[in-house]
Amino acid sequence: MERTAKRSVNAVLAGEIETKVTALASDLIGCASVTPLDAGCQAILREQLTSAGFSIEDMRFEEIDNFWAAHGKGAPLLVFAGHTDVVPPGPLESWSSPPFTPTVKDGLLYGRGAADMKGNLASMAMASMEFVKLHPDHKGTVALLVTGDEEAAAENGTVKVVEKLRERGEKITWCVVGEPSSANVLGDTIKNGRRGSLTGYLNVHGVQGHVAYPERALNPIHNFSSALSELCSIEWDKGNEFFPPTSFQVSNIRSGTGAENVIPGSLEAVFNFRFSTESRPDSLRMAVEELLRKHNVQFDLTWRLSGQPFLTYAGKLLEAARGSVKKIIGIEPQLSTSGGTSDGRFIAQPGTEVIELGPLNATIHKVDESISTQDLASLYFVYLDMMESLLA
């Protein structure tokens, strides 16, 4: 493994890998792949991976492009997961350079998706290609799962690719999701889990009437307010050493006709639980519905479970990731389960270790999104070193 460390340091200093990875990342950024559009982005990756000896399987579901690129055979199966779709750039005039014209300035690569996550995807792809070149007869399988549906509904992307893999008996052993996990410096944080997400869509029924005759109406705002106050005050759980306590947040409330003298006939609210492994979605649903009935709220309520919580608290993948970050970057990464959901929720299952390891997240989804070109190279060597630890 010392040979890898020497090779990485020499390459970073010479700028060879930095130049190559930046070039691939720039090609990807140049594709305006705002969900659900691909704009030719995945074809760039497929072509390079095919040339490196990977077998490519296109997995298009409805209007979403996805692909599975694999090299090797059997277990263990190490997967690098990423997405080519990006969020809209927002006002173009606010950008210092066009969002889909990759621009390098002062060591930073600018463009929509630079950090989330085309830059990192380039690092993963090039590291994987280098690994199979150096170790053509490696153990097991190394694969890339690339989706075009992460930033939007996430209904026709990773979740369906994983379903297809499971149907044919391909079980993922380890998965590195390339989301931008770093907070202050590259490699300072590894996400070893994520909270679950459960959203409720509530419709409170009232009776519309004149504000001067409240006895002839039923105000859904008043009806719901006491229940809401209690919902906001509940301690749902205490969390644990890996997760903070489960949180309840209301994101939208809408009621009223716009007139100042009309009691509304209905109220709509949207709320969300970000829940730890100490709570279950069924128990949260039941608790909310029982509380609403206790407060005599007349309601309809539908639920959407976006993902269960997952946690990789130990294992070979986490050991390899921490060791490679320490070796290549020279820091000890911290473990965290903070933040929103990721596609890791679709991949996590019993027996599968899942982590997120990627670049700084300071500029993601922002105007002038950027990534350090040196960090692109460092990530390349971290991923390469991890592959050599696990599969060489």
Question: What does each model-identified segment do?
Answer:
Residues 76-79, 108, 143, 173-175, ...:
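Structural motif
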Residues 117-193, 391-392:
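Acidic/histidine-rich catalytic neighborhood of metal-dependent amide-processing enzymes
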Residues 2-92, 266-270, 283-290, 373-375:
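N-terminal helical capping/dimerization or prosegment-like subdomains
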Residues 102, 149, 209:
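Acyl-CoA/ACP chain-elongation machinery
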Residues 1-9, 16, 57, 180-185, ...:
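Metal-dependent amide/peptide-bond hydrolase catalytic core
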